[in-house]
Amino acid sequence: NPVDDIXIAKPRDIPMNPMXIYRSP
């Protein structure tokens, strides 16, 4: 899933990728 990569690659972009919160706390 690209969402997982985004969250891991850009954990600082939480506001842009709220899914990253669930994937990478």
UniProtKB/Swiss-Prot annotation:
Name of this protein: Antithrombin-III
GO cellular component, as recorded: extracellular region
GO annotation (BP), single: blood coagulation
Keywords, comma-separated and alphabetical: Blood coagulation, Hemostasis, Heparin-binding, Protease inhibitor, Secreted, Serine protease inhibitor
Subunit: Forms protease inhibiting heterodimer with TMPRSS7.
Posttranslational mods: Phosphorylated by FAM20C in the extracellular medium.
Function: Most important serine protease inhibitor in plasma that regulates the blood coagulation cascade. AT-III inhibits thrombin, matriptase-3/TMPRSS7, as well as factors IXa, Xa and XIa. Its inhibitory activity is greatly enhanced in the presence of heparin.
Molecular function (Gene Ontology), one example: serine-type endopeptidase inhibitor activity
Compartments, as annotated in UniProt: Secreted, Extracellular space
Family: Belongs to the serpin family.
Keyword field contains S-adenosyl-L-methionine: no
Domain of life: Eukaryota
Tissue and organ expression note: Plasma.
